[in-house]
Amino acid sequence: MANYYTDHPEIEFHLNHPLMKRVVDLKERNYAEKDQFEDAPVNYEDAIENYKRLLDITGDVAANIIEPNSEDVDLEGPHLENGRMIYASKTFENLDATRKAGLWGLSMPRRYAGLNLPNAIFSMASEIIAAADAGFQNIWSLQSCIDTLYEFGSEEQRQKYIPRICAGETMSMDLTEPDAGSDLQRVMLKATQDEDGTWRLNGVKRFITNGDSDIHLVLARSEEGTKDGRGLSMFIYDKRDGGVTVRHIEHKLGIHGSPTCELVYKNAKAELCGNTRLGLIKYVMALMNGARLGIAAQSVGVEQEAYNEGLAYAKERAQFGEKIINFPAVYDMLSRMKAKLDAGRSLLYCCARYVDIYKALEDIARDTKLTPEERQEMKKYTRLADAFTPLAKGMNSEYANQNAYDAISIHGGSGFIMEYKCQRLFRDARIFSIYEGTTQLQVVAAIRYITNGTYLSIIKEMLENEVSDDLKALKERVAKLVELYEAAINKVKEANDQAVHDFLARRLYNMTGDIVMSLLILDDATKAPEMFQKSANVYVRMAEEEVLGHSAYIQNFKAEDLESFKA
């Protein structure tokens, strides 16, 4: 029987990473709840076994319910009835299956009926579900919006809303408007207070994923007369209170099971989450960082499924009297797909572990004073998480698109036929590098860590890691790429021209990702050569190809060259 967890032992490899011990010890606060809750682990080993059981259940549901439903969901999609969004019929089956399996409220504390799982484990479950159906993964993974309410909401709000999400109610984050896409400081949905202090929301939200959810986090303008981000606050809207209707459901290229809605707020009752004026500059940034990690996991799931589809077809398809998997042009594509998958997954879980450590320490700090060592640790991992999140989202969303493209190429003409899954993967993946911040915006988020030397210091530290003897030559090649990378950064900084900086930023970003993932996959191949040695060989060569090209481009670029590129 298929299982999307046990069929891919690479996921369990990352579950057993040495840093997971620190992650789990912090998340479980040294197992303080072992006598209070029946499902609380007594030690690290017990926690890991719990995670394996949950991921095994997730893999079973994904392979045997969600994936078999995926084609019907893609064909039917959601529809509109009297101002309400109605899911595709099989989506209701998926929701029911995940609720019965206990796959809701994963990250929330047990006192609110959650499972208290680390972000790394939630990301693994997200990857597994996305491999089965990326559209449904959107609906399911938006439960992570509750993390923002947990962090910034009141205790009364936590007790009111978190148990509902843990029971399987759905969420959405209502940020985008017709005139406020990437530029969220232009949000104009109005928040006003009645005489009794009740907040009311009026206006329109657009492109809202799962927009008719049970509980919404809404970005709205609470400060009259303001036009920038400092006038925006975060609100909680409960569908039970009414006041919001769905005006339109978008007819999209892909992720058909995930409803994308235009919402009309008419005097909708809402609750302020946190403090006024901090909606965009603090709360949405936290919300978006979580969402970006979610898209990285979604991307890795589709990278895996696209590779699976391409590999299976190449093994069975024969041309010129031979299976096409034996043709160099085909196994070149497949090896690159696998290398991107393995390196991208390593980056995803590396980032998730960093997020886990700083988030757990932040949570502990709400109840007790951190030691100086813990404060230093939180500062370190906050910096690492902030640096790695835009890399994980941007690089993996691009890799998902590339793997889906190559899966179709391997299928040839059959890949262009709707009966084959690879066409759906291609359509679904296209949005990954757009929503929750385009790849260009991930570059904007990452560039300061490039120019201030953060990535370079991380990379040089990673270069100190020992690799197995048969990988040392590859590591030396990566070390030479680091020299080119440092020279490229210096060349761009010396230009002292913002337009040049912006134009070359994407190339520096790609170089960063290529080098970081080269070092990660070398580390993985040292620990598990049977799993990752081939991918390490392929990925480092692929990175070398990319970095050398970007280096030459940057070193030969002059400010006056910009004129050739302007429309």
Task: Give the residues covered by each predicted segment.
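Internal helix-loop-helix
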Residues: G59-D60, K90-P163, A167, T209-G211, ...
